[in-house]
Structures are given as structure tokens and as C-alpha cells.
Amino acid sequence: MRDLHNNIAPKRVISPVSVADNTAQVGQIIDRQGFQALEYVILTGSLSDADATFTVLLEEGDASNLSDAAAVADADLLGTEALASFTFAADDKVFKLGYKGNKRYTRLTITPAGNASAALLAAVAILGDPQLAPTANPPA
């Protein structure tokens, strides 16, 4: 049996944060070089505002600073941005969004609307199917 531990590289996207307004939470740019698979995992804690919605956007590009960023086409997503988006009712939940496009760089953004209270959230990227295994531990 092949293990998962030596074949993934987790990356921080959005550090755990308490969001109390409608400021977009723009994630770290993820570089896929050396990996053929990418999955974003979004985690929520307590979402206090009873009117809040949180919309997920995934962008891609070839420039390392994503100056050429464009929204990822639906055909290059595993799952949908709508399924990864959430409302105030999603306390303590986990959502996922996969990428199967061919661009080197991607970035996840979570944009709140109607949010005026503490909303706890975080996101990580899991790079998989490495060209070279085992992957570094601890992750680079």
C-alpha cells in the first residue's frame, strides 16, 4: 500500500483568522511546480453573524506574483466554487476545492458579505502526486 504522508506537501493559504467585516481574505499564492495535484481545504469555526455569506474564488496564472491572474474555468475545477462557498450556518465545517488546470500558480480568496461579527476561518492547500517522493518533512 502506498502511503499518503510521503506523497503530499501541505501549504498554508489563509492562517486562522477572525474576520469581523467584509474584507476579502486573500490567500497565499501556491506554486504547483513539482506536483500534479492540488486540493484546497477550507475550515470554519464559529460564524457569528446570522446574515453572513462567504464566497470562494480560485485564480490561476503563469506569473509568480499572479499579475496575470484570471478566475479558474469551471472545467479546471474539481468541485465548484459554489460548493466551497458557505453561509453563517456552516459553523465548524470543512470544504474542499480541487484544481486540475495547467497553470503553475493559484490563489484562493474568501470574500465575506453581510458579516459584522467574528467569523473564524482558515485554509490550506494540499499538493499531491509529486515528481519526487518522499516529500519534505517538515514541509518546506
Residue ranges and their predicted role:
Residues 1-12, 112-140:
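C-terminal interaction-tip segments
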Residues 44, 58-62, 112:
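Residue-level signal for short segments within beta-strands and strand-turn junctions
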Residues 49-91:
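Non-cytosolic beta-sandwich-type ligand-binding/adhesion modules
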